[in-house]
């Protein structure tokens, strides 16, 4: 018997939507859905490599996701004499180069963690010091051990979410950057491409930069501002047009990175432009809203500062065609509002558009309705919209609601990164959807932001309560799910929590019952969507 999901794939239909009666059945199905243990191949398989990931909570906004890797090393020269050489280990976080750190500094960090957390940590030990100089083979073995140590360390909320880890990661980045000046200026672009320049320290973290921006723009409530907006790294959307400067005329950002508090935006931006610019496509910083439902945005329209900032982004999205198609009557109304600069009415008109408030991702390949299907992706309105084309070239949008996504994860086959989520296609029918994209980590963070907004709303929490809850949060709980079938001939890297079975810190039982508001996003293991179990009939 062919399942409804399989028929949907073969016929290219949209994911099922539900009537009011079906909603009740689906809700019951979702609440009773069991999570199957995720079985992974053994590490003896030479074609298989296991990576780790973790999400520590940002102390003021949404959960961070940290995936740490130490892929290689480099030889550096001592600053003191300019002659003596030493080996530095290149640390990458969330797929981006973070810094090059010498062994002694990493060892000091490990000793600090051991002292702070006493005997509770029983994961992989940090490699010991050696009396003699290491040969290349020994250096690589040490690198692998350092990688395993960090990947195990960040799996444990009590450790990874501690301010010491955040502070040390920030310090590694800053020390590695070797800035020539302590005080700098930083350009941040608002939603319409308008540039605001702030003065800051090279070492200022993302949170500090957000506070400076908040003050510069005249917002009185820092918590509310930081909760509703995020600092992103972006580049020009048109790959054929080199972008050496950003103006209000050419502003059409393609987000590449959601900056978190373990990094300094000035350093992250400078490093990205040193290492990753191609054909004149330089990265820049921009402020984007993190609001996924018009009902959340509506109360903000009583504050003139929020209205102005939201209007700038909405107007630019409209000009760039990101709200198309727009009905003729609403289109005329939007143009009229723009002509008389009626920002509040413009936003309220946007709230009537189903195409408003989306972040447009890069085109990618997906396996829905069949493998290798080109698609366009956008995140917003508490859902993911994938637009494919039929044989005649006609666009066919498929809508995936956030409340129907049970788990999501990131995997890697060879050099190909994929974002995968398990979706409730029909009653008791779940199916994995795979997107092959280099924006996988960004998509995970956006989906987490959407889930957090849903949970906050269901908990009837004020912004102040939400922020305080996150500030005092001590951990997340991650559940497992079934693994995806794969071609056995292809080596696959599944980002997995290696220590989840042993729980060296003995804290996971406590976190299982902790407030599920702070769901972990993990590119390491399948992530259970807590909004999935807290939904109401209106969400289905």
UniProtKB/Swiss-Prot annotation:
CDD domains cross-referenced by the UniProt entry: FERM-like_C_SNX17 (cd13337), FERM_F1_SNX17 (cd16121), PX_SNX17_31 (cd06885)
List the keywords (alphabetical).
Answer: Cytoplasm, Cytoplasmic vesicle, Endosome, Lipid-binding, Membrane, Protein transport, Transport
State the domain notes: The PX domain mediates specific binding to phosphatidylinositol 3-phosphate (PtdIns(P3)).
Give the PX domain ranges: 67-176
Cell compartment(s), UniProt: Cytoplasm; Early endosome; Cytoplasmic vesicle membrane
Superkingdom of this protein's organism:
Eukaryota
Q: Which InterPro entries match?
A: PH-like_dom_sf, PX_dom, PX_dom_sf, SNX17-31_FERM_F1, SNX17/31_FERM, SNX17_FERM-like_dom, SNX17_FERM_N
Membrane topology summary: Peripheral membrane protein
The similarity comment for this entry is: Belongs to the sorting nexin family.
Q: Which organism is it from?
A: Caenorhabditis elegans
What this chain does, per the entry, is described as: Critical regulator of endosomal recycling of numerous receptors, channels, and other transmembrane proteins. Interacts with membranes containing phosphatidylinositol 3-phosphate (PtdIns(3P)).
What is this protein's record name?
Sorting nexin-17 homolog
For the region Disordered, what residue ranges are annotated? 1-24
Which molecular function GO terms apply here? Answer: phosphatidylinositol binding
What does the entry list as the binding residues for a 1,2-diacyl-sn-glycero-3-phospho-(1D-myo-inositol-3-phosphate)?
102, 104, 129, 142
- Protein encoded by which gene: snx-17
One biological-process term from Gene Ontology? endocytic recycling
Q: Name one GO cellular component term.
A: early endosome
